[in-house]
Structures are given as C-alpha cells and as structure tokens.
Amino acid sequence: AVLAEGKISEIHTRFPPEPNGYLHIGRAKAIWINWGTAKKYNGLFNLRYDDTNPVKEDDEYVQAIEEDLRWLGAEPNGGIFYGSDYFDKCYEYAEKLIMEGKAYVDDLTRDEMREYRGADAGKPSRPSPWRDRTPEENLDLFRRMRAGEFQEGEKTLRAKIDLASPNMNMRDPAIYRIKYAEHHRQGSKWCIYPMYDFAHPIQDAIEGITHSMCSLEFENHRPLYNWVIENIFGTAFPKQREFARLNMTNTVMSKRYLRELVEMGIVDGWDDPRMPTLCGLRRRGYTPTSIFTFVREAGISKSDNLIDMRQLEACIRSELDLTAQRRIAVLDPVKLIVDNYPEDKTEYFDVANNPNREANDTTTRKVAFTKELWIENEDFAEVPPPKFKRLTIGGEVRLMGAYIVKCTGVEKNTDGSIAAIHCTADLETGNGNPADGRKVKGTIHWVSAAHAVDAEVRLYDKLFTEANMNAIPEGSDYKDYLNPESVVVCKGCKLEESLKDAKPGEKFQFVRTGFFTPDSKNPGVYNRVVTLRDSFKPAK
C-alpha cells in the first residue's frame, strides 16, 4: 500500500542475523519473508550482521551465514553490512539524546534497575535517583564511560521515556552498557556498546530500510523502535512488522542447545545431517526449493505454531521424486548365484533413470548382470511369513529390469548364517514375461558382484523422540529425549557401478529404499535424505 500511495519509492528489507551461531531452518522463514518481499516488489534486500555484542561473535559464523544465504539463492542485492560499522553513528545519536534531555547515565546495578522499573511481580516503577542529572553531567559521564573510567555494570546509559508505561520496554530502557571485550571487527576500539533495541532502528534508518520484519517476540519492542526513529530521525520510516517464529517437531532451535550438542560430541558438528541448521540440511540433501516450499506452506501468522517435520520431508520427497535419478543399492547384502548363467559373461540391461511420467525423463543407463549378484538379506526367507512375495526356496521373483529367477537352495556358514543363495534364471524373460504366461508377484533389486561399488550408507531419522521439545517438563534435561536411533550406519553396502562417480550435491533414489546423496565430508558415504514414502498428509 505504501508503495502504491507513493510514500516510498521502493521496498527495502534486511535480514539481520547475529553471527554467534549457524542459521537454522527457523531463520529460513525470516530470510524468505524479507528477501521474498523485496524480490516480489523489485526492491532491495540487505544482509546485515548484528554484531553489537562483542562476546559471542565470530568470523566463522559470518562466513557460514553468507554461504547459507547464497545457497538459498537469497542474494543480498542491497549490500552486505555490519552493525558494528555504525558504532560511531550510534554514539553520536546517543550524545544527541543526552543533550536533548532524552537520555541519562544511571548508577543503578542491573538488579536494582530491574527493581526500580517494577519488573518483578508487576510492581509500579519508580525513578532512579540519577534520572534528573543535567545533560552536561550526563554527557561528561557518558564520555568517561567511553574512555574506560568505569567498571562493567557501574554505569549504564538509559533512554528517558515513560516510567508509567504498561510496556516494560518503555520504562527507561538501557541503550548503552560497558563491556570490556575484544570485538571481532572493531578490536579494542570500544568499551561501551549499544543495546540491540537502540542500535537496530538506527541501522535500519541509515540503510534506508522501509520494512523491518522480525519475529513475534519483538512486538512489544515496536514502541521503543518507533521512539528511537522519531527522536533521532523524525521520520515515519522504517516500519517494524512482526511474524511468528517457525518451530518444528522433534528438534530444538535454541542456539545454546545446538552448541551444546556440537561441543559435547553428541552430533558431528553444526552440519551434522540430523541438525536443523541450514548447513546440516544441505549436507543431509535438502534443497533450497524444498526449504522455501516448506516455509511457504507453514504460512505467515502472528501465532506461534509447531510444524510437523514430516511436512518438510514431504516437500523434499515430492521434489526428488521428480528430479532424482534412480540407482540400485543393496544395504544389507547377501550373495545370489545364478547357477545356469555363464561364469565369464557380462550382460547389460537398459534401465530407466526416472520412470516417473511427470519427470519427462526418457533416458536410460546400462546396468551390468553377471553370474554372481548381491541382493538384500530381507528379500530372502527360508521360512517365509504369510504374504511374503519375495524370494523363497522353490519360489520365483523378478530381478528388477532383468530375469525371473527361481531359488534352488542355500549355502550356510558354520554359524548357520547364509553364505550364498543359489537360483536358476529363466533366460527367456530378460525382455518380458515368461512364455507360458505364469505370474510372478515379487520384484527385488540387485547389483552385479563383479561391478559393485562398496559404500557406507547412513540412515538418518529425527534427532529427538519428543515431538514438542518446547513443552518438556520444567527442570528436565532436553538430552534425555535424544533419539538413540537418530542414525543407523550400514557398512559394506553394495552400489551399482554408475555411482562410483557420484558427487556431493547429487541426489538419487535408491530403488525400494529411499532418497540419498553423497556425503560432502566423507567419500564413499551416502546420507539418506528421506524415506520413499510416509503416511503423513501435508497441509494444503
């Protein structure tokens, strides 16, 4: 509306992450809203690192955040900025407020300030004994704060607003504090730092942001945001707007918890495929399209909601069903010997890369067939359960894309385990059904033993057993809810020959098994992106 009415010439948004951790999927919602809004209206989108707190920030996170944005395709066409670049301006504006009698240096401790503001049990506020210092005295004290003459917590600069306000954020909030810490960009230049609620609107205004969109917990901060804009710039823009955070089942979004999982070695780094981080989802095999589809389906609202992670899985499953080429992988192999097939013969069958009609993929690949094959252990049963349609002694199955075979017996190891299964092939069925018209109900996948590629396959599942980790009993340890089967490692897997050249980032459907991608850190390892199917019905 403001664009159509001519109040602004273009939409300008920003994404302001604090570089103290890796971005998770909840932050993808903020990126989608801010970047997506700017893109929709041909506007500008900034990436701004909110690095006003010197204690927690690190260049490692700066680089990771930028990599995540570029991977998502959310190009910051308005530029990349740092909140710390505006420290001089923030200080200048703080002095302006002091001289106008709108800010004062307070000697109350943090706990005393909380008591005076009436933060406990909704008590009425009362003015600090130092609220009525003169502008000249406040300016002198503030400059001495900057010069390092006081200890941390000894002095604080507060905005003078409204102690009677029902909104705690308006009861003379702190806008500068003393902090002796090395800043990742500014070094030791500063020993006083602006509070987020003071720095954020200033940064937005300087960059020309028109719409400052943030999560719902900042809704009560909006009056303070507007107060800073009006009292420093005297303008009507930027405008702050809020949206509910995105929460997902069976995981945690708290940076503190995620950091603990990494530091305690419970997960394999921030990019562990079980983590809700964007780098973890990328390593798992999720795509930017699937993540933004999930965020869009979750919707924008002003009420917090918990989204089933299976909805995210449904998004990537739908995408990969169309885009992923099919390959054959045997995760728990047992040898199948075709006794009536020549020892020295190799035959190649043409197999469709993606039989899904909607994929419009008519390409095929050559798959080698030899006397000795690998099949899945679970596709054979000496004593089959009811309705078992796979291979049994005396029974027939179709080897997917190749011959019908009949099991004639098994070889066993001394411990009773199966060493090899023997069968004969109906060599007239390589290109179709048997001549006598008999029906074979079961079809199983296989890999030529002579051409197989060895691999490790990791089957990932939800990280926590509890769906709503925000609702666990107070005082309980979130780590008690870790899923002991969040990853199952399958070693000694046998993959078809074409996968020897597969690269990280490529996605495949292992037929009858799931969707997989090569791990970006460990050659010869494949990560399960998602299972082939699920009973979950995504929201429309």
What are the language-model segments listed below?
Residues 4-66, 182-215:
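N-terminal catalytic cores of NTP/NDP-binding nucleotidyl/phosphoryl-transfer enzymes
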Residues 4-7, 36-44, 70-77, 205, ...:
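Secondary-structure transition/capping motifs at alpha-helix termini
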Residues 8-9, 103, 151, 168, ...:
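Intrinsically disordered or highly flexible coil/loop and linker segments, enriched in small
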Residues 17-19, 48-56, 79-88, 111-112, ...:
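Conserved short loop/turn motifs at secondary-structure junctions
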Residues 51-53, 59, 96-258, 316, ...:
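Active-site cores that bind ATP or allylic diphosphates and position pyrophosphate for catalysis
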Residues 61-88, 93-94, 101-104:
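A glycine-rich helix N-cap at a beta->alpha junction
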Residues 218-222, 226-228, 292, 296-299, ...:
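Core subunits and conserved enzymes of cellular information-processing
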Residues 238-315, 319:
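Long, charged, mostly alpha-helical binding arms that flank functional sites
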